Swiss-Prot record:
Pfam family, one: GatB_Yqey
Alphabetized InterPro entries for the sequence: Asn/Gln-tRNA_amidoTrfase_suB/E (IPR017959), Asn/Gln-tRNA_Trfase_suB/E_cat (IPR006075), Asn/Gln_amidotransferase (IPR018027), Asn/Gln_tRNA_amidoTrase-B-like (IPR003789), GatB (IPR004413), GatB_C_1 (IPR042114), GatB_Yqey_C_2 (IPR023168), Gln-tRNA_amidoTrfase_suB_CS (IPR017958)
Keyword Ribonucleoprotein in annotation: no
Protein name in UniProt: Aspartyl/glutamyl-tRNA(Asn/Gln) amidotransferase subunit B
Organism this protein belongs to: Variovorax paradoxus (strain S110)
Subunit structure: Heterotrimer of A, B and C subunits.
Gene assigned in the entry: gatB
Reactions catalysed, as given in the entry: L-glutamyl-tRNA(Gln) + L-glutamine + ATP + H2O = L-glutaminyl-tRNA(Gln) + L-glutamate + ADP + phosphate + H(+); L-aspartyl-tRNA(Asn) + L-glutamine + ATP + H2O = L-asparaginyl-tRNA(Asn) + L-glutamate + ADP + phosphate + 2 H(+)
Function per UniProt: Allows the formation of correctly charged Asn-tRNA(Asn) or Gln-tRNA(Gln) through the transamidation of misacylated Asp-tRNA(Asn) or Glu-tRNA(Gln) in organisms which lack either or both of asparaginyl-tRNA or glutaminyl-tRNA synthetases. The reaction takes place in the presence of glutamine and ATP through an activated phospho-Asp-tRNA(Asn) or phospho-Glu-tRNA(Gln).
Single annotated GO MF: asparaginyl-tRNA synthase (glutamine-hydrolyzing) activity
SMART domains: GatB_Yqey
Source superkingdom: Bacteria
HAMAP family from the UniProt entry: GatB (MF_00121)
Entry's EC annotation: 6.3.5.-
């Protein structure tokens, strides 16, 4: 961008879907009255000790299995020391030197180009409370309901080179954590929060100074914030100034980032092993028990579609955007649909209507069985493609529920009278002398105009492939 290379890395906090907190039995339910879900452990009262939540560990194992990571047989919890009003202990329990999940990668498509972002680690930690600044005059309120909520912080290498790539990575990671059920992915409630580390440099130069954009809680704001930060840093460098390392917040009202604090280094937090928690031991048998509970992963499902149905990797990736979408496709194929045709309709006409109405495929008025019947009629030649959209529309609006009945009621069967079709062909050729001349002169595209005229004259009942062949024969 503007002669600079963009370098982006991500830190994502995924709130784990446990019913209780990571080191206490207090509830993690969202939306309760302030300070009604904070127990003695969360409040750091004297004499309390943390007790590890087994469910949080198993969710971390699931992520490691999903991303091809190494799951550490022994990991250690550490105290991350800093002062903030909503952190009762004066430190956060996290992992530093030996995280539970190490390495791995997230692969995704940017357009039709396959990308891979490497992971450094994913570590377990507790969330802090929340400072409330609204409805208070001259002071702030503290809500400790969130204190101790289990988080998995997922850290990438600085592998992303554009805003689009960064957002695509975040969407893919969001898909994975919700697919395997370790996080509900609700960005509005803070269940999936992303921090983007952004820097720029001239090609071939050493890495530039990075600035961290905190708590991006929507993909739209993520794009706007990263774009603004990139341009801001380039402007600073072009004006001869240095980039200062800092943590910034994005203001969606102004579309700008503002400095929150100068960025700390690890030494500022004075990490040391937590003496109240023993090392976390994860045996191979435990990993295998967790593996047995895992659903088929989107990556494995996409590979199956490529292998069994002869799909492209891109089409397979589109169909595995969510478990519900993949399930719909599988149900259509089980009902007899040709995989390629079913894929085209699901990612084409179906997706267009779902997006327009802002609903998921679970709420689609056309069932997988109805779609299978529809594409079956296209495949056997009973229904031309353009007429198929009329049938789909009737199914979608509820005007009909049986494909064959709709075809019959709307008289959509293809022309069987070859004499009538031949007369239409002759009329179209006679009325479109210019197209005929251009086609005979070597312009293949001119034939498309003639085919379109025949389809229009036949009321969409002619078979386009048959029309094309007949026209070629007539025009020599």
């Amino acid at each position: 961008m503007r002669g600079y290379e963009v370098i982006i890395g991500f830190e994502t906090h995924a709130q784990l879907s446990t019913a209780s907190k990571i080191f206490s039995r207090a509830s993690t339910a969202f939306g309760a009255e302030p300070n009604t879900q904070a127990c003695a452990v969360d409040l750091a009262l004297p004499g309390t000790l943390p007790v590890m939540n087994k469910g949080a560990v198993e969710r971390a194992i699931k992520l490691g299995l999903a991303l091809g990571s190494h799951i550490a047989p022994r990991s250690v919890f550490a105290r991350k020391n800093y002062f903030y009003p909503d952190l009762p202990k004066g430190y956060q329990i996290s992992q530093y030197e030996i995280p539970v999940v190490q390495g791995g990668a997230v692969s995704f498509f940017l357009g039709e180009e396959k990308k891979t972002v490497r992971l450094v680690r994913a570590h377990l930690e507790e969330d802090a409370g929340k400072s409330l600044h609204e409805n208070f005059i001259g002071q702030s309120g503290i809500d400790l309901n969130r204190a101790g909520t289990p988080l998995l912080e997922i850290v990438t290498e600085p592998d992303m080179r554009s805003t689009a790539e960064a957002v695509a990575y975040a969407r893919e990671l969001h898909k994975i954590v919700t697919w395997i059920g370790i996080c509900d992915g609700n960005m509005q409630e803070g269940s999936f929060r992303c921090d983007a580390n952004v820097s720029v440099r001239k090609p071939g130069e050493k890495l530039g100074t990075r600035r961290e954009i905190k708590n991006l809680n929507s993909f739209k704001f993520m794009q706007q914030a990263i774009d603004y930060e990139i341009n801001s840093q380039i402007n600073e460098l072009e004006d001869g100034r240095k980039i200062e390392q800092a943590t910034v917040l994005f203001d969606p009202d102004t579309g700008e980032t503002r400095t929150m604090r100068t960025k700390e280094d690890a030494a500022d937090y004075r990490y040391f092993p937590d003496p109240d928690l023993p090392p976390l031991a994860i045996e191979a048998e435990w990993i295998e028990r967790v593996r047995a509970t895992m659903p088929e992963l989107p990556r494995a499902m996409a590979e199956r579609y490529v292998r069994d149905h002869g799909m492209s990797e891109y089409d397979a990736a589109q169909l595995t955007q969510s478990p519900a979408l993949a399930r719909y496709f599988d149900d259509a194929v089980k009902a007899g649909a040709t995989p390629k045709l079913a894929s085209n309709w699901i990612t084409g006409e179906m997706a267009r209507r779902l997006n327009a109405q802002e609903i998921g495929i679970e709420a689609a008025p056309v069932t997988a069985q109805q779609l299978a019947q529809l594409v079956g009629r296209i495949a056997d030649g009973t229904l031309p493609n353009n007429a198929a959209r009329q049938v789909f529309d009737a199914l979608w609006t509820g005007e009909g529920s049986d494909v064959d009945a709709i075809i019959e009621a709307r008289d959509l069967k293809p022309m069987s009278d070859t004499g009538a079709l031949d007369r239409i062909l002759d009329e179209v050729i006679a009325k479109n002398a210019k197209n005929v001349e251009e086609y005979r002169g070597g312009k293949e595209k001119a034939l498309n105009g003639l085919v379109g005229q025949v389809m229009k004259a036949s009321g969409g009942k002619a078979n386009p492939a048959q029309v094309t062949e007949l026209l070629k024969a007539k025009l020599g």
